[in-house]
Amino acid sequence: MSRYRGPRFKKIRRLGALPGLTNKKPRTGSDLRNQSRSGKKSQYRIRLEEKQKLRFHYGLTERQLLKYVRIARKAKGSTGQVLLQLLEMRLDNILFRLGMASTIPAARQLVNHRHILVNGHIVDIPSYRCKPRDIITAKDEQKSRALIQISLDSSPHEELPNHLTLQPFQYKGLVNQIIDSKWVGLKINELLVVEYYSRQT
């Protein structure tokens, strides 16, 4: 299954706010109407919607998300918490959380087009897993810095999660540590996602 490229507002109207996909927000009235039309949801549908929320927020294909779930299952600790940490530490998501890109798809484009350096080296893989002490910078070219400046200027300037530090005038972000689960940028019940996959495999 490929990455979703359809109308973004349609997805947030059904699943709720997905800040990684779009900075638009659903109208509360339309949320209530959708709930009343759908009636009582089955447990399967509830789990499916949480999984879809995770997939669309981080911009993953079904195969990619399943791969992350399998990695999380093999790691120590809560599978759901490890899954969220893996997704949050992706390079495209780190750029988004720093405000260097307005959405995760925009961050992915920056990486694909070789505008981003990690520890002084160009990285063109959006799924690159960042680690503590990584230094993320824009390439020292006018176009690269101009693209990031647009995002920094339009960023809502919310409090940065505690695992990141931004130095905007140097177009630089620092990864201080692995993300703490309370700073995950999406309202999600990750246990329902794990349950969904445990029933599929």
Swiss-Prot record:
<comment type="function">
    <text>One of the primary rRNA binding proteins, it binds directly to 16S rRNA where it nucleates assembly of the body of the 30S subunit.</text>
</comment>
<keyword id="KW-0934">Plastid</keyword>
<keyword id="KW-0694">RNA-binding</keyword>
<feature type="region of interest" description="Disordered">
    <location>
        <begin position="17"/>
        <end position="44"/>
    </location>
</feature>
<dbReference type="GO" id="GO:0019843">
    <property type="term" value="F:rRNA binding"/>
</dbReference>
<dbReference type="GO" id="GO:0006412">
    <property type="term" value="P:translation"/>
</dbReference>
<dbReference type="InterPro" id="IPR018079">
    <property type="entry name" value="Ribosomal_uS4_CS"/>
</dbReference>
<protein>
    <recommendedName>
        <fullName>Small ribosomal subunit protein uS4c</fullName>
    </recommendedName>
</protein>
<comment type="subunit">
    <text>Part of the 30S ribosomal subunit. Contacts protein S5. The interaction surface between S4 and S5 is involved in control of translational fidelity.</text>
</comment>
<keyword id="KW-0150">Chloroplast</keyword>
<dbReference type="Pfam" id="PF01479">
    <property type="entry name" value="S4"/>
</dbReference>
<dbReference type="InterPro" id="IPR036986">
    <property type="entry name" value="S4_RNA-bd_sf"/>
</dbReference>
<comment type="function">
    <text>With S5 and S12 plays an important role in translational accuracy.</text>
</comment>
<dbReference type="InterPro" id="IPR001912">
    <property type="entry name" value="Ribosomal_uS4_N"/>
</dbReference>
<dbReference type="Pfam" id="PF00163">
    <property type="entry name" value="Ribosomal_S4"/>
</dbReference>
<comment type="similarity">
    <text>Belongs to the universal ribosomal protein uS4 family.</text>
</comment>
<keyword id="KW-0699">rRNA-binding</keyword>
<dbReference type="InterPro" id="IPR022801">
    <property type="entry name" value="Ribosomal_uS4"/>
</dbReference>
<dbReference type="GO" id="GO:0042274">
    <property type="term" value="P:ribosomal small subunit biogenesis"/>
</dbReference>
<dbReference type="GO" id="GO:0003735">
    <property type="term" value="F:structural constituent of ribosome"/>
</dbReference>
<feature type="domain" description="S4 RNA-binding">
    <location>
        <begin position="89"/>
        <end position="149"/>
    </location>
</feature>
<dbReference type="GO" id="GO:0009507">
    <property type="term" value="C:chloroplast"/>
</dbReference>
<dbReference type="GO" id="GO:0015935">
    <property type="term" value="C:small ribosomal subunit"/>
</dbReference>
<keyword id="KW-0687">Ribonucleoprotein</keyword>
<dbReference type="InterPro" id="IPR002942">
    <property type="entry name" value="S4_RNA-bd"/>
</dbReference>
<dbReference type="InterPro" id="IPR005709">
    <property type="entry name" value="Ribosomal_uS4_bac-type"/>
</dbReference>
<keyword id="KW-0689">Ribosomal protein</keyword>
